[in-house]
């Protein structure tokens, strides 16, 4: 089973990168590929740009990567209560290649933040919009106060309750 894990941030030190990678490796027998949002850099989407530039290679490559997956894990960073600009822009361009961005594949949405909110707002946005992008949502989990529950030196969750929720 091939698992595609994506952290929806451009930060190389993203806590959502750590969470997506950790969660993907919990799938027994899974082959994991972690996608870097920076590999799909695109100009700001607009209809005018789409008319002049057409479908861009990075958006097509993103759709093609998701086609390879048997399951997808997306860990969402929250900026001002919603998606990061880079992730929203990628969704906008990718949805022009194929409205069915997630291609009816099983998707788990995760979100975390350093604070007690756990990026719950962006998680709600993702789950609510998932049907529009043809995601077969199998679960979602917000993890508040990430640094209180994750050991950076071992790259492991230290909270057994949260770990159990992820495994489910």
Locations of the language-model features?
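N-terminal beta1-alpha1-beta2 submodule of the flavodoxin-like/Rossmannoid cofactor-binding fold
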Residues: 1-92, 96, 153-168
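Short glycine- and Lys/Arg-enriched binding-loop motifs that mark or flank ligand-binding interfaces
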Residues: 4, 77, 100, 111-114
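Amphipathic alpha-helical interaction elements
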Residues: 8-12, 99, 115, 135
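Residue-level detector of flexible, active-site-proximal loop/helix-junction positions
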Residues: 10, 39-41, 114, 144-147
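Phenylalanine-focused residue identity feature
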Residues: 40, 62, 87, 109, ...
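A glycine- and small-aliphatic-rich helix-loop capping segment at beta-alpha/alpha-beta transitions
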Residues: 89-99, 127-132
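Short, glycine-/small-residue-rich phosphate/pyrophosphate-handling segment
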Residues: 103-145
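A charged, well-structured terminal subsegment
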Residues: 130-168
